[in-house]
Amino acid sequence: MITVSAIVFVRGDGRVLTVRKRGTTRWMLPGGKPEAGERAIDTAVREVHEELGIEIAPEELELLGAFDSHAANEAGQGLRATVFTTRRVVDPVVQAEIDELRWVDPADRDPDQAPLNLEVVFPILTGTARRS
């Protein structure tokens, strides 16, 4: 099981920031794996700074939830993602291991999106999540 933290950045037009890491084909939320002893929220803050040059304080984030899914780029691996959201206006810059970024409509069913986005996060954002 891979553990990650991520942030959903939502623009005023409802589009969500996604990134594609170098050497991969799937689009995912900005974020990444924790360092030893790091809290999920601190991981998310650190990763978006490293990947996109975005400085954001933990107080600016709201917990969307902790979700299980499938890793986008590591076949056969499970994923445990703690996901935060913010409507803070950001101007991301591609850095570190990020190759590209794009703002997407979460209602679109782009098959190049990571399973976490398609199966969990985007349905929550669009109000189409299945209720158990």
Question: Where do the protein language model's features map onto the residues?
Answer:
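Conserved hydrophobic "DFG−1" position in protein kinase catalytic cores
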Residues: F9-V10, T18, T86, W103
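The catalytic Nudix box helix
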Residues: L29-L64
